[in-house]
Amino acid sequence: MKVTCEVEDIMANWPKVRYAIQQASLIVPEKERDVLVYNTACEILTGHRKIWILHDGVNIKAIVGAVIQKSGGAESVPSIIISPIFGFTPMTVEDKELLKKGLMDFARNNKCNVIYGYSANPKAWVIAEKIGMTFVAKVYKWEVV
C-alpha cells in the first residue's frame, strides 16, 4: 500500500496527512482493512523525504522520516538516513517488524544503503528501540550499517 501526498512540513500539514491515510483505507475491502492498511507502514512522499506512518486503526503509533541522499566515498551510493520524528508506545513485535520491513524493502527496491542517525529527541530513541534499530553515530556523523 503506497500513499503519496504533497506535504512540505509533516506537522504543519497534519490534516492533509491524516486525510491521505483515510483515503488509502477506502480502497481496501473492509474485512482486510485493519491488517492491510493500518498495520502497514504507509509511505507519504514529501519532496526528497519519505515518511512512514504506522497506524493501528485507531491511533498513529509511529512516524519515521528518512532522507534519501548520496553518501560519500569512492563510489557515491544512494542512502537512506533514518531520522525518527516521533512515536507512541506500546508497539508490538509485529508493529516493529512491519515498520522495519517497509524501510528495508524501500532501500532494497531503490538500491540504497541504510544509515542510522543520532537524535537527542527522547521520542526518537523510543522508536529506535521499538523497531530494533541502533543509532550508531552522533550529531552530523553517519555510519553505514
Please report, for each region that a protein language model flagged, where it lies by residue.
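A short helix-loop-beta-strand connector motif used in the catalytic cores of GNAT acetyltransferases and
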Residues: 41-53
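Short glycine-aromatic motifs
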Residues: 48-49, 128, 132-135
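Short amphipathic alpha-helix that is part of the acyltransferase structural core
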Residues: 1-35
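Conserved beta-strand in the GNAT
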Residues: 53, 58-69
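A short, polar/charged loop-to-alpha-helix boundary motif
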Residues: 70-78
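Membrane-anchoring hydrophobic segments
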Residues: 23-30, 45-48, 108
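Acyl-donor binding region in acyl/amide transferases
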Residues: 77-131
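Conserved catalytic-core motifs of GNAT/GCN5-like acyltransferases
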Residues: 134-145
